[in-house]
Curated annotation (Swiss-Prot):
GO terms for cellular component: cytoplasm. GO terms for molecular function: metalloendopeptidase activity; RNA endonuclease activity; zinc ion binding. This is Endoribonuclease YbeY. Zn(2+) binds at H116, H120, H126. Its EC number is 3.1.-.-. Single strand-specific metallo-endoribonuclease involved in late-stage 70S ribosome quality control and in maturation of the 3' terminus of the 16S rRNA. It is found in: Cytoplasm. InterPro entries: MetalPrtase_cat_dom_sf_prd, YbeY, YbeY_CS. One of its GO terms (biological process) is rRNA processing. Its cofactor is Zn(2+). The lineage of its organism: Bacteria, Bacillati, Actinomycetota, Actinomycetes, Streptosporangiales. It comes from Thermobifida fusca (strain YX). The keyword Ligase does not apply.
Length: 155
Protein backbone atom coordinates (compact mmCIF):
# COMPACT_ATOMS: atom_id res chain seq x y z
CA UNK A 1 0.00 0.00 0.00
CA UNK A 2 1.40 3.37 -0.97
CA UNK A 3 0.56 6.15 1.50
CA UNK A 4 2.23 9.49 0.95
CA UNK A 5 1.95 12.12 3.70
CA UNK A 6 3.30 15.62 3.09
CA UNK A 7 3.19 18.57 5.46
CA UNK A 8 3.17 21.82 3.50
CA UNK A 9 1.68 23.76 6.41
CA UNK A 10 3.58 25.85 8.90
CA UNK A 11 2.32 23.62 11.71
CA UNK A 12 4.46 20.72 12.95
CA UNK A 13 2.70 17.38 12.46
CA UNK A 14 3.49 13.72 13.02
CA UNK A 15 3.58 12.53 9.42
CA UNK A 16 4.55 8.98 10.39
CA UNK A 17 1.55 8.71 12.70
CA UNK A 18 -0.77 9.93 9.93
CA UNK A 19 0.62 7.31 7.56
CA UNK A 20 0.13 4.62 10.22
CA UNK A 21 -3.44 5.79 10.85
CA UNK A 22 -4.23 5.74 7.14
CA UNK A 23 -2.79 2.23 6.83
CA UNK A 24 -4.85 1.11 9.84
CA UNK A 25 -8.06 2.46 8.29
CA UNK A 26 -7.39 1.03 4.83
CA UNK A 27 -6.52 -2.37 6.32
CA UNK A 28 -9.64 -2.33 8.51
CA UNK A 29 -11.78 -1.58 5.46
CA UNK A 30 -10.05 -4.25 3.35
CA UNK A 31 -8.73 -1.83 0.76
CA UNK A 32 -6.42 -3.55 -1.73
CA UNK A 33 -2.74 -3.57 -0.65
CA UNK A 34 -1.74 -1.95 -3.95
CA UNK A 35 -4.03 1.06 -3.43
CA UNK A 36 -2.48 4.52 -3.30
CA UNK A 37 -3.40 7.40 -0.99
CA UNK A 38 -2.03 10.88 -0.49
CA UNK A 39 -2.54 12.97 2.68
CA UNK A 40 -1.55 16.62 2.48
CA UNK A 41 -1.47 19.21 5.26
CA UNK A 42 -1.80 22.80 4.06
CA UNK A 43 -2.16 26.27 5.57
CA UNK A 44 -5.40 28.25 5.58
CA UNK A 45 -4.80 30.23 2.38
CA UNK A 46 -4.29 27.22 0.06
CA UNK A 47 -7.18 25.42 1.80
CA UNK A 48 -9.44 28.44 1.24
CA UNK A 49 -8.43 28.44 -2.44
CA UNK A 50 -9.31 24.74 -2.77
CA UNK A 51 -12.57 25.24 -0.87
CA UNK A 52 -13.70 27.99 -3.26
CA UNK A 53 -12.48 26.21 -6.38
CA UNK A 54 -14.02 22.80 -5.65
CA UNK A 55 -16.93 23.47 -3.27
CA UNK A 56 -17.77 27.09 -4.16
CA UNK A 57 -17.60 27.88 -0.44
CA UNK A 58 -15.60 30.80 1.01
CA UNK A 59 -12.85 30.47 3.59
CA UNK A 60 -10.74 27.55 4.71
CA UNK A 61 -12.33 24.28 5.77
CA UNK A 62 -10.99 21.44 7.89
CA UNK A 63 -10.70 18.62 5.34
CA UNK A 64 -11.33 18.03 1.64
CA UNK A 65 -11.24 14.73 -0.22
CA UNK A 66 -10.42 14.34 -3.89
CA UNK A 67 -11.21 10.81 -5.10
CA UNK A 68 -9.43 9.38 -8.14
CA UNK A 69 -10.57 5.82 -8.87
CA UNK A 70 -13.96 4.90 -7.47
CA UNK A 71 -12.67 2.40 -4.92
CA UNK A 72 -14.97 0.96 -2.27
CA UNK A 73 -14.20 -1.02 0.88
CA UNK A 74 -13.62 -4.73 0.36
CA UNK A 75 -16.20 -7.33 1.29
CA UNK A 76 -15.61 -9.77 4.16
CA UNK A 77 -12.81 -12.10 3.08
CA UNK A 78 -11.98 -10.00 0.00
CA UNK A 79 -10.11 -6.79 -0.63
CA UNK A 80 -11.22 -4.00 -2.93
CA UNK A 81 -9.83 -3.57 -6.42
CA UNK A 82 -6.37 -2.00 -6.65
CA UNK A 83 -6.19 1.63 -7.71
CA UNK A 84 -5.55 5.21 -6.71
CA UNK A 85 -7.81 6.14 -3.83
CA UNK A 86 -7.10 9.88 -4.06
CA UNK A 87 -6.05 12.80 -1.88
CA UNK A 88 -7.08 13.96 1.58
CA UNK A 89 -6.19 17.60 2.30
CA UNK A 90 -6.24 18.77 5.93
CA UNK A 91 -5.79 22.27 7.36
CA UNK A 92 -4.07 22.03 10.79
CA UNK A 93 -5.00 25.61 11.76
CA UNK A 94 -8.71 24.87 11.33
CA UNK A 95 -8.18 21.53 13.08
CA UNK A 96 -6.58 23.33 16.06
CA UNK A 97 -9.61 25.61 16.49
CA UNK A 98 -12.02 22.69 16.22
CA UNK A 99 -9.98 20.64 18.69
CA UNK A 100 -10.12 23.45 21.24
CA UNK A 101 -13.92 23.70 20.88
CA UNK A 102 -14.27 19.90 21.13
CA UNK A 103 -11.98 19.67 24.16
CA UNK A 104 -9.40 17.31 22.71
CA UNK A 105 -5.91 17.56 21.22
CA UNK A 106 -5.10 18.85 17.77
CA UNK A 107 -3.62 15.41 16.98
CA UNK A 108 -6.94 13.76 17.87
CA UNK A 109 -8.72 16.22 15.58
CA UNK A 110 -6.29 15.58 12.72
CA UNK A 111 -6.79 11.82 13.22
CA UNK A 112 -10.55 12.37 13.01
CA UNK A 113 -10.25 14.52 9.88
CA UNK A 114 -7.94 12.04 8.16
CA UNK A 115 -10.37 9.21 8.93
CA UNK A 116 -13.31 11.30 7.72
CA UNK A 117 -11.51 12.20 4.50
CA UNK A 118 -10.59 8.58 3.76
CA UNK A 119 -14.20 7.50 4.29
CA UNK A 120 -15.30 10.09 1.73
CA UNK A 121 -12.73 8.71 -0.72
CA UNK A 122 -14.31 5.29 -0.24
CA UNK A 123 -17.76 6.57 -1.15
CA UNK A 124 -19.21 7.34 2.27
CA UNK A 125 -21.21 10.54 2.66
CA UNK A 126 -23.35 12.29 5.25
CA UNK A 127 -25.82 14.30 3.18
CA UNK A 128 -28.82 12.20 4.26
CA UNK A 129 -29.64 11.15 7.85
CA UNK A 130 -29.12 7.42 7.20
CA UNK A 131 -25.80 8.11 5.42
CA UNK A 132 -24.76 10.36 8.31
CA UNK A 133 -25.46 7.63 10.88
CA UNK A 134 -23.58 5.01 8.86
CA UNK A 135 -20.53 7.18 8.15
CA UNK A 136 -20.14 8.66 11.63
CA UNK A 137 -20.73 5.29 13.30
CA UNK A 138 -17.98 3.74 11.18
CA UNK A 139 -15.72 6.76 11.77
CA UNK A 140 -16.15 6.44 15.55
CA UNK A 141 -15.57 2.68 15.40
CA UNK A 142 -12.36 3.11 13.39
CA UNK A 143 -11.03 5.85 15.67
CA UNK A 144 -11.78 3.79 18.78
CA UNK A 145 -9.88 0.85 17.27
CA UNK A 146 -6.99 3.15 16.33
CA UNK A 147 -6.78 4.51 19.89
CA UNK A 148 -6.81 0.95 21.28
CA UNK A 149 -3.96 -0.01 18.95
CA UNK A 150 -1.93 3.00 20.15
CA UNK A 151 -2.55 2.04 23.78
CA UNK A 152 -1.41 -1.53 23.09
CA UNK A 153 1.81 -0.21 21.50
CA UNK A 154 2.55 1.81 24.62
CA UNK A 155 2.41 -1.27 26.87
Amino acid sequence: MSIDVANESGVPADEERLARLARYILDALRVHPLAELSVLLVDEEPMADLHVRWMNEPGPTDVLSFPMDELRPGAPGRTSEPGILGDVVICPQVAARQAERAGHSMQDEIDLLCTHGILHLLGYDHAEPDEHREMFSLQNELLAGWRRSLEEEER
